[in-house]
Amino acid sequence: MSQRVRRNGSPTPAGALAGGAVGPPGGPGSRLQPMRATVPFQLKQQQQHGSPTRGGGGGGNNGGNGGASGPSGGGGSGGPRTASRSTSPTRGGGGSAAARTSPTVATQTGASVTSTRGTSPTRGTAPGARSSPPRPQPPPPLLGTVSSPSSSPTHLWPSEVIAAPPSARVRHRRRSPEQGRPSAEKRSPSAPVCKAGDKTHPPSSSSSSIIRRTSSLDTLAAPYLAGHWPRDIRGQAAPCMRDKATQTESAWAEEYEKKKGSHKRSSSWGSTEQLKEIAKLRQQLQRSKHSSRHHRDKERQSPFHGNHAAINQSQAPAPKSTLVPAGPITKSSGSRFRNSVEGLNQEIEIIIKETGEKEEQLIPQDIPDGHRAPPPLAQRSSSTRSIDTQTPGGADKGSNNSSRSQSVSPTSFLTISNEGSEESPCSADDLLADPRDKENGNNSPLPKYATSPKPNNSYMFKREPPEGCERVKVFEECSPKQLHEIPAFYCPDKNKVNFIPKSGSAFCLVSILKPLLPTPDLTLKGSGHSLTVTTGMTTTLLQPISMASLSTNTEQERVSRGTSTVLPSASLHAPPEPIEEAEG
C-alpha cells in the first residue's frame, strides 16, 4: 500500500489509501462485505483499517473530518483519518492512543500506517498501529466498541500493536494493493478529494452501507452482541424483575399481553428485539420449570393462592398455581417450548392423582364446565338404576331367553328404569317376543328393529318391507331347496367338465343342446362353412350357430368331438355313421 501511495506522489493519497484500507470496509471491503456477517473478518478489517487514525485523525490533521469520521465508523471515515495521519507525525502517538480507544481504530491504523510510512515519521507509531490490527481481531465487540471505545481499547495497546506488526503488515499489504489501486487513482489529486472518491467509488456499495451502519452502530452492534453477551446481561436483569410476577395471575396476564403485542411486531423489528423476546421466554420457562418442580410448596403458599391453600390444605391450589403460568407460556413461546410445557402438564397430572378423592370433589368447582369430563357415576349406579348399568344387570339376572332382548329393545330400558323389579320387564319382553317370533313381528312395531340377535333365534334381524312390497318369511328365503325341486336343465352335468372348446366360439353345440337332443337322430351337416342340426331343434337355438363362420377343419374337429361327447351323455347307441359331412 505504502509503495503505491508513494507512487501517487502525495502523502495524503497514501493516507487516502490507508483510508481506502479503512474504506476497505469500503474499497476492498466491498468485496469482503458479505463476510461481515462473520465477526472475525469485520474485526480484522475494521481494527486494521481504522483504529489509530480515529483517535489521532479525529483530533489531528483531519480535524472535523477525522473527528467526525472517527466516531461515526471505521469504513467511510477511515479515508480521511488515514490522510490526516500521513500528513502529521503526531498521529503516530495519536494512532496508538486511538488504538487504545477503539478497536476499529486498529484496523484503520494498519492501513493508515502503511500509507503514513511513505509520508511521515509517524511510521514508528504507525507500525505499532499496524501490529495492533491482528490483536484487535480477538475482540468481537469492535462493532459495539465503535460506539464506546472504552470496551475494546485494552486489546490495542501500542506495545501489543508493535509486537504483531509483521502479520498486520502482510494482511494490509495483501488487501491494500486492491484497495490502493482504485483509492490511489481516485485519491491521488488531493487528500480531501481522495477521501470523497474513496467513499463514493470503490466503497460505493460497501461504504454506503458502512455509513448507514456507522450512523446506527449501536443497533447494528446489538445483533452481534445479542448473539453472545447481551443475552446473558438481559437474562440476568430480567429474572430479578419477574420472579415476583410469576406468582400472580394478573402479572402473568399482563406479561402475556405485552409479549403477544411484541411478537406481532417482532417480524418487522430488528433481530435484537426478537433475540430479547427469545431470551425472556427462555428465562420464564426455566423459572416456571424450576418453580413447579422444586418450589411447589412455595407456590402453594404464595399470597395469591393463600386462601385456597388454607381451605383446601394445599391440595387443589397446587395444580391451579401451575396451570395459571402454563397458559401464557404455551401461547407466547409457541411450538419451540412445548417440551417444557408438556413436562408441566405431566406434573399436574401426577399432583391430581396424588390428591385423591378430595381432589375430585374440589376440581369440578375450580375448572369451568366443558374442560373436564363429568365425575364417574359409580356411586349413583349402585343405588339407582340407569340405562348405562342395565345391560350387564339384566343379562345376568334375567331369563336366558329374554335377557338379551331386554338390553336391546328400547321398551326394556323404559320398563327397567321405571319399574323397580327386574322380573316384570322380563315377562313383558317374553309376551312381546313370543308372538313376535310366531307372527314375524306383526304385533310389536317398536321392538322389531333390534340391534342384537338371540342365540335361540327367538328374534331375527328383520326390516319392514317397503311400501307395496310383499312380506316374505325369512325361513323360506333362507331354507335351501331340495334337488328334486330344481329342474334337471339347471343341474351341472358331470360329462360337461371334460368338454373344452378350442375354436374360441362362445356357442358350443354339445354343451347347450345336449339335454334337449333326441336319442337316435343326430345329423350334423356342414354346408357353406356352417353347421345345422336338423332334428328336434328349433331355429332360434341354432341361429347363433349358423351365424358363426367356421373352416372345414374346425367343423370336423367339432363334429368329432361333439359325437364323442354327445353319445355317452345322451346315451346314444347309434354308431357315428348317420353323421354326414358335406363340404361345400
Curated annotation (Swiss-Prot):
The keyword ATP-binding does not apply. Residues 133-142 have a biased composition (Pro residues). InterPro entries: Glcci1/FAM117. Residues 80-90, 114-132, 204-214, 399-412 have a biased composition (Low complexity). Residues 145-154, 379-392 have a biased composition (Polar residues). Residues 53-79 have a biased composition (Gly residues). It comes from the Eukaryota. It holds the Pfam family FAM117. Residues 287-297 have a biased composition (Basic residues). Keywords: Phosphoprotein. Residues 1-214, 227-461, 551-584 are annotated as: Disordered. Residues 350-361 have a biased composition (Basic and acidic residues). The modification Phosphoserine is found at S10, S102, S206, S215, S216, S268, S340, S386, S444, S452. This is Protein FAM117B. It comes from Mus musculus. The lineage of its organism: Eukaryota, Metazoa, Chordata, Craniata, Vertebrata.
